[in-house]
A protein has these predicted regions:
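Active-site phosphate-binding/coordination module
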Residues: 3-6, 10, 117, 133
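A metal-dependent, Asp-based hydrolase signature
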Residues: 7-83
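Acidic/polar active-site rim loop that often engages polyanionic ligands
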Residues: 2, 40-43, 124-128
Length: 179
């Protein structure tokens, strides 16, 4: 969605989108394709498209995505977030999505903490470096950090996952749920 907003506002050229990623995105968007296929194909294109962009542009389009698309979350997911918050659970988003989007979603849903892939900026310009959070190794490191920070008992914890990168996270908790 963020990539599409960058195209809509003429921040990046739509030619790259149509030549490289549109069909894979449409398959995933209709839930007919695999998210990992979409992620692999678009990740490099997305990162290359952001190189040299001012953080203000990225923040503006991110805000538009949250404003217009943040309710496009599965009903089940929303109900589980609400249930956990209503029961005073610590709720943490660990996502491979860009951290600047994950933070905005976490704020919208009033969760305890979050982490996403870290996109690095130099002098307010994206420099092309991404510290990923979509793989099992990165997610395990994040989990370890949150366990220490919040004194979490993983045997009593829940995890929800929808990608291959979530498998080890699901194995680590007492209440794993694959979506």
């Amino acid at each position: 969605e963020h990539f599409k907003k960058l195209i809509k506002y003429d921040i990046i050229d739509q030619k790259a989108w149509f030549e490289h990623a549109r069909d894979t995105f449409m398959d995933w968007d209709k839930r007919q394709g695999h998210y990992d296929d979409y992620l692999d194909e678009i990740c490099d294109l997305y990162v290359k498209s952001l190189i040299g962009l001012d953080k203000t542009c990225i923040d503006f389009t991110s805000d538009q995505v949250i404003k217009l698309k943040s309710d496009r979350v599965y009903k089940y997911t929303r109900s589980r977030i609400k249930w956990h918050l209503d029961n005073n659970h610590i709720v943490i988003f660990i996502s491979g999505s860009p951290g600047f989007l994950v933070e905005k979603m976490a704020k919208k849903y009033n969760v305890t903490d979050c982490i996403g892939s870290n996109y690095l900026f130099e002098n307010v310009m994206f420099n092309g470096t991404v510290i990923p959070m979509w793989d099992s190794r990165s997610k395990n490191t994040a989990i370890d950090s949150f366990v220490e920070k919040y004194d979490i008992d993983l045997n009593k914890s829940y995890a929800y996952g929808d990608t291959n990168g979530d498998i080890n996270m699901l194995r680590r908790v007492g209440n794993p749920i694959a979506i």
